[in-house]
């Protein structure tokens, strides 16, 4: 809508009764969640949803730095009123798509080495079992240990790095190992919330995929399975996506807010130099913390310990993945893409 119309609408909303404002806010949140639910039903939609999640993470971080309220990003409309009709009504959607493509490619580079190693451990183990290749019996387990070890280290690092990438839009910061580990070390105990939330999401994913094996034996579902198996699968993943998206939003919110508060804490404790921050970080943080560029205190080995000590707590996330594949094998895609880590799509 034109700028004048937008301002008039905002003034009317401010004068509206609190009940009306609360109702419209709830309705808007429901519509946005419904769109996210629809996007999670396909790979292309999941890329768009990933871009939307990144913008949510950005807004959460900015809210921490500015002391403002979190505002969920729009799905379609442009943030500004300039441009033609098409731009004003679709700009956010295209921004989500561009952000999602960049995020998915960057995450693939970061996550696929451990995911491929874990997948190879599974296939190597089964092939060795079928063909009785006892002289290669250790190959599968050793690959599994290596892949899970890499995965646990990755998951200890990823939430902060992902939040930083989402907030700044700079993909290189996803691989800024030293700075990101310094940020992670700012919250050695608060970080325990992350593996708990991710494991809860992993259990949900395992349930959505694994329980599908037993669906034809449940009386309440037999009719739907026999009538139209394809439609049953569509409905199955759609309904499971509701709690999944809720947990996805919670996990990314926690990661973004921990990252944002870690920067403030690091500056206050002189563990991070103001000049090392990205331009976007300095821009938003200037109102929350007026601090000159100081000499940074060295971190060293102690920083690494504070950052990585919860690494073993990520093991249950990978255990749930193996258990789910034992119950209901969904192929290589199930190993390569964990919905809470890469593309937010359950199947």
Residue ranges and their predicted role:
Residues 1-148, 152-199, 207, 248-347:
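Helix-coil boundary and N-terminal low-complexity module in membrane systems
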């Amino acid at each position: 809508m034109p700028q004048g119309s937008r301002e008039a609408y905002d003034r009317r909303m401010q004068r509206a009764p609190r009940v009306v404002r609360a109702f419209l806010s709830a309705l808007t949140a429901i519509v946005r969640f419904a769109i996210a639910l629809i996007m999670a039903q396909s790979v292309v939609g999941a890329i768009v949803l990933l871009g939307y999640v990144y913008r949510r993470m950005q807004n959460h971080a900015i809210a921490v730095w500015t002391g403002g309220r979190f505002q969920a990003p729009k799905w379609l409309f442009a943030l500004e009123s300039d441009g033609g009709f098409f731009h004003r009504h679709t700009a956010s959607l295209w921004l989500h798509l561009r952000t999602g493509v960049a995020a998915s490619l960057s995450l693939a580079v970061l996550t696929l080495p451990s995911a491929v190693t874990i997948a190879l451990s599974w296939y190597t183990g089964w092939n060795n079992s079928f063909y009785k290749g006892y002289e290669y019996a250790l190959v599968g387990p050793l690959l599994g240990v290596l892949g899970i070890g890499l995965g646990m280290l990755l998951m200890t690092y990823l939430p902060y790095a992902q939040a930083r990438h989402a907030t700044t839009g700079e993909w290189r910061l996803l691989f800024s190992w030293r700075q990101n580990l310094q940020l992670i070390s700012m919250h050695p105990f608060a970080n325990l919330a992350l593996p708990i939330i991710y494991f809860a999401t992993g259990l949900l994913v395992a349930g959505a995929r694994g329980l599908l094996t037993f669906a034809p034996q449940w009386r309440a579902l037999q009719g739907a399975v026999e009538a139209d198996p394809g439609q049953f699968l569509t409905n199955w993943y759609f309904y499971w996506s509701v709690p999944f998206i809720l947990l996805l939003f919670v996990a990314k919110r926690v990661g973004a807010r921990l990252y944002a508060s870690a920067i403030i804490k690091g500056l206050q404790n002189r563990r991070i130099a103001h000049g090392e921050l990205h331009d976007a970080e300095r821009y938003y943080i200037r109102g929350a913390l007026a601090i000159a560029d100081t000499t940074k205190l060295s971190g060293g080995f102690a920083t690494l310990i504070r950052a990585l000590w919860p690494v073993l707590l990520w093991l249950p996330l990978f255990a749930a993945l193996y258990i789910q594949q034992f119950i209901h094998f969904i192929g290589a895609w199930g190993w390569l893409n964990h919905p809470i880590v890469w593309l937010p799509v359950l199947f």
